[in-house]
UniProtKB/Swiss-Prot annotation:
CDD domains the UniProt entry points to: LTA_synthase
Top-level division of the source organism's lineage: Bacteria
Protein name: Phosphoglycerol transferase I
Origin species: Xanthomonas campestris pv. campestris (strain ATCC 33913 / DSM 3586 / NCPPB 528 / LMG 568 / P 25)
Family: Belongs to the OpgB family.
Gene giving rise to this polypeptide: opgB
Reaction it catalyzes: a phosphatidylglycerol + a membrane-derived-oligosaccharide D-glucose = a 1,2-diacyl-sn-glycerol + a membrane-derived-oligosaccharide 6-(glycerophospho)-D-glucose
NCBIfam families according to UniProt: PRK12363.1
GO biological process: glucan biosynthetic process
Enzyme class: transferase
Pathway, per record: Glycan metabolism; osmoregulated periplasmic glucan (OPG) biosynthesis
Protein transport listed as a keyword: no
Length: 702
């Protein structure tokens, strides 16, 4: 298919210069296609699977803590491709390539080839895949398959779960990687060694692999395009995961990881599902660990696993059953990192001097050392050790080699009473890891969420089986049910709580939020990004409910209260105010049937300050100059406390020079003062200069 795409792009280029008719339109369309393909190429290098669920998740989730510097080479190539994508526009400036004949036929051929190019490109494939995965489906048939553990544990053994970052079992292949992982290879002969373990959709990146293995469900965001990590108060509140179950059984759950726990919502997941302690990179900074022990992603694995050993001893001495979970980091794609403990260690390979191979060799030694310490300790007899890859390796310096191998995840279980065996699965995935551990703890337990024990010969239907059959035709039903775990299914009542969050079902969401319901008033989509644009462009057969400050809906609202605009399928509307939202409103309640005005174009807040600033109490004059601004009056306000408290607000009209002056009175010091304007999505404002003037002193400029 790649050669077909290359040929079609070449033909498009020839058709572009063949005729001047609609030349700029053709050049623009070709450049747009090339830009999209360039963006896809960058995403594919990062995800290893084009635009998939992981891509969408990380775009919506908090990206703080990502080691962006590791991908500088990919980004540089992407910038070069962007510049190359603009070449069709430059080409039109070369007059000699333009031929004034056959304009209509040439343009028709150009359109046909453009459609062919899209059809054979990965853009169409990934778009089709995402459509099938995210389209509404009836999940009712799989609801009975979602099972939570209820049976009490008779023997409460301690658990140590070691996730190896991208440390797939494929690296065990002695023909390709001789002697690369001798320690884990030896441990596999002493363990329950699970083979052919795959990663299904919604489990192929770190947080998704953890959710899949510990909850038995694929990770999807809540319905729609919401930034689930930054705006959702709870992480999968309707899911019941391994940590929840073990906590109910009297366990203490302890996590130690080297990366930032806020990245992709990992810390939120753990805190929401039974973990008592979550230590991340900040914990190691607070301990005073020297900078030489950190990479762009966080603390190195030698320091991390030493801390895990210390935690194991401390938890064991306490006498309470526990699950200690740790996640390594130094084998992260694309090139890995080498801690000080392995600086003098090298892996000699016919493949060459590849840094990632050194990192894998080091990780094998460090994990093997931790496991040996635990097993040889006086607490080892009462401990089950799980060694697992969080997911298959993403594109890295060994991608060309791995592409020729049979890829499989790593999953080992070691314990005193666990007889070694190799379990070859026919349709197993990381969704089944937690259920398998539960059977080792309690033989009668074989399910966790949609996961099924891989040791059970009579396991009931599972999501893993559905993902492996008929090209995964029925797997979207499991994804659809997993989405409901973000909000629950009773979502027709809305209210705003004392923290200013919208309560929908079991979830708490920071507004602005647009909720779309189907014609049966079942929650269909949640929008938390570009909400005013979505509201203007969404024409639903059901009901829309938009919750934001009343300023978004009314010119005369200056009290900072919350309002909800509800629009039914007949375009009847009602604006609910703060007292109604405090009590709660039913989105399926009948609305006023009197003639309605056109649906309003709601406003959205636009930040004018570059960052929040600490400001002392006193009276100020806000002065700003806006080079680009709306032609009409608009609201400007000062806010604090994560934009939840409105300190000052004024309806402003810039003068001819774009100057705006507004008094701001602060009764007490504010740690996070920000200035914002309320505009609809078609308007924009560009601030050239902004200052807070206190008496005659000028505050810091932003």
């Amino acid at each position: 298919m790649h050669w077909i795409l290359a040929l079609s792009l070449l033909l498009l280029l020839l058709l572009l210069v063949a005729s001047p008719r609609l030349a700029w339109l053709k050049a623009g369309l070709l450049s747009l296609l090339l830009l999209l393909l360039s963006a896809w190429g960058l995403v594919d290098r990062l995800s290893g699977d084009g635009v998939n669920a992981a891509t969408l998740y990380h775009l919506r989730a908090d990206m703080d803590g990502a080691g962006v510097s590791d991908f500088s080479g990919y980004i540089a190539v992407f910038i070069g491709m962007v510049l190359l994508s603009l070449s069709p526009l430059v080409l039109l400036r070369v007059r000699r390539f333009r031929r004034p004949r056959g304009g209509g036929a040439v343009f028709g051929a150009f359109v046909v080839m453009l459609l062919v190019s899209v059809a054979v490109s990965p853009l169409y494939r990934d778009g089709k895949r995402l459509y099938y995965q995210l389209r509404p489906v009836d999940y009712a048939t799989v609801v009975p398959e979602y099972q939570v553990p209820q049976q009490p544990l008779q023997k409460r053994k301690n658990i140590v779960w070691i996730y190896g970052e991208s440390l797939e079992r494929t690296y065990f292949d002695e023909a390709t990687f001789p002697g690369l992982m001798p320690n884990l290879h030896q441990l596999a002969t002493e363990a329950v060694d699970v083979r052919n373990l795959t990663s299904t959709e919604g489990s192929g990146w770190t947080i998704a692999g953890m959710v899949a293995s510990m909850c038995g469900v694929p990770l999807t965001t809540a319905p729609g395009d919401e930034n689930s990590m930054g705006r959702m108060g709870l992480f999968l509140p309707e899911a019941r995961c391994l940590g929840d179950y073990l906590k109910d059984q009297g366990y203490r759950n302890h996590y130690v990881g080297g990366a930032d726990a806020s990245f992709a919502g990992k810390g939120s997941f753990l805190a929401s599902h039974g973990f008592d302690v979550v230590h991340d990179v900040n914990y190691f900074h607070d301990k005073g660990v020297a900078p030489k022990h950190f990479s762009a992603w966080g603390v190195h694995d030698d320091v991390l696993l030493d801390d895990a050993w210390d935690s194991f001893q401390t938890l064991s001495r306490a006498g309470q059953p526990f699950m200690l979970t740790t996640l390594t980091m130094d084998t992260h794609h694309p090139a890995g990192h080498l801690p000080l403990a392995c600086k003098n260690q090298r892996y000699e390979s016919p493949l060459g001097d590849i840094g990632l191979l050194h990192a894998i060799k080091c990780s094998d030694r460090l994990i093997g050392r931790l496991v040996t310490r635990i097993r040889n300790s006086r607490y080892g007899r009462n401990t089950i050790i799980v060694i697992a890859s969080d997911h298959l390796a993403m594109p890295n310096d060994l991608s060309d080699v791995l592409a020729k191998q049979k890829r499989e995840n790593l999953l080992l279980f070691l314990g005193k009473d666990i007889p070694p065996q190799q379990v070859v699965t026919r349709a197993g995935s990381t969704l089944d890891s937690g259920a398998t551990l539960l059977q080792l703890l309690e033989p009668g337990m074989r399910t966790l969420g949609f996961g099924r024990s891989l040791l059970a010969n009579d396991a009931p239907p599972s999501a893993s089986v559905a993902a492996s059959r008929d090209s995964g035709k029925n797997y979207p039903r499991y994804l659809a049910y997993a989405r409901t775990l973000w909000t629950g299914r009773s979502t027709r009542m809305l209210r705003v709580n004392g923290n200013g969050d919208v309560v929908v079902g079991v979830q708490q969401v920071r507004p602005p939020v647009l909720l779309e319901y189907d014609d049966n008033t079942n929650l269909k989509t949640v929008y938390l990004e570009n909400t005013s644009r979505q509201f203007d462009r969404t024409h639903s057969d059901g009901t829309l409910a938009y919750v934001d400050r009343c300023t978004a809906f009314e010119d005369g609202s200056a009290d900072g209260d919350w309002c909800a605009l509800v629009v039914d399928r007949n375009q009847h509307m009602k604006l609910y105010r703060d007292p109604d939202l405090t009590r709660g409103i039913a989105v399926d309640a009948p609305l006023d049937v009197t003639p309605q005005a056109p649906r309003p174009r709601v406003r959205q807040p636009i930040m004018l300050t570059q960052a929040a600033r600490k400001t002392e109490a006193g009276r100020y004059m806000l002065e700003l100059y806006a080079k680009r601004r709306p032609t009409r009056a608009f609201w400007v306000e000062a806010v604090s406390s994560e934009r939840k408290v409105v300190l000052a607000q004024q309806w402003v009209v810039p003068d001819a020079s774009g100057r705006i002056r507004m008094p701001v009175g602060l009764e007490h010091a504010v740690e996070d003062l920000e200035i914002r304007a309320w505009l609809d999505y078609t308007e924009e404002v560009s601030v050239d200069d902004l200052a807070l003037v206190k008496d005659t002193a000028v505050a810091d400029r932003s």
